[in-house]
């Protein structure tokens, strides 16, 4: 299932949730390294996205990105937001509330182009559980909610 950022997706099944939790656990247990690796992969594959991060200006190589405290800080925030979604899979109202709030911040305060949510979600899905339809469905749920303020 490709990751989508509009419309809706079917609810996650119990089996999908179990598989997501299993795939996510080792990533989150090493969240600092995992988060930086994901964000570096995102920026090296999609350099135009970096323009929305003024603090990352001038960081042009993967090594520079990995060594940046600002990149590490933002990577941790991304990983924690995904973790909140994983933890909240059984409480979609809670997940929706948190992600809609995050959407508002990205739309109004940071003016991020929402197309990049889907690109980053694909990098996360590929890193965590490449080809797993359930994880891609969760990433779609996240992307749809992150676009809600746009």
UniProtKB/Swiss-Prot annotation:
Q: Name one Pfam family in it.
A: Globin
Matching InterPro entries: Globin, Globin-like_sf, Globin/Proto, Globin_lamprey/hagfish
Family matches, as Gene3D superfamilies: Globins
Provide any one GO MF term from the record: oxygen carrier activity
SUPFAM superfamilies xrefs: Globin-like
Keywords on record: Heme, Iron, Metal-binding, Oxygen transport, Transport
Give the domain of life.
Answer: Eukaryota
Residues at which heme b binds:
74, 106
- All residue ranges annotated as the Globin domain in the record: 11-150
Q: Where are the transmembrane segments?
A: none
Family of the protein in this entry: Belongs to the globin family.
State the name under which the record lists this protein. Globin-2
């Amino acid at each position: 299932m490709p990751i989508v950022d509009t419309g809706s997706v079917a609810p996650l099944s119990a089996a999908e949730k179990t598989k997501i939790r299993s795939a996510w656990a080792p990533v989150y247990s090493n969240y600092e390294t995992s988060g930086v690796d994901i964000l570096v992969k995102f920026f090296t594959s999609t350099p135009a996205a970096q323009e929305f991060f003024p603090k990352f200006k001038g960081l042009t190589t993967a090594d520079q990105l990995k060594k940046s405290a600002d990149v590490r800080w933002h990577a941790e925030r991304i990983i924690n937001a995904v973790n909140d979604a994983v933890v909240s899979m059984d409480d979609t109202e809670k997940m929706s509330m948190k992600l809609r709030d995050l959407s508002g911040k990205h739309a109004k305060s940071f003016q991020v182009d929402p197309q990049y949510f889907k690109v980053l979600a694909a990098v996360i899905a590929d890193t965590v559980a490449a080809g797993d339809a359930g994880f891609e469905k969760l990433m779609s749920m996240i992307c749809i909610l992150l676009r809600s303020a746009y």
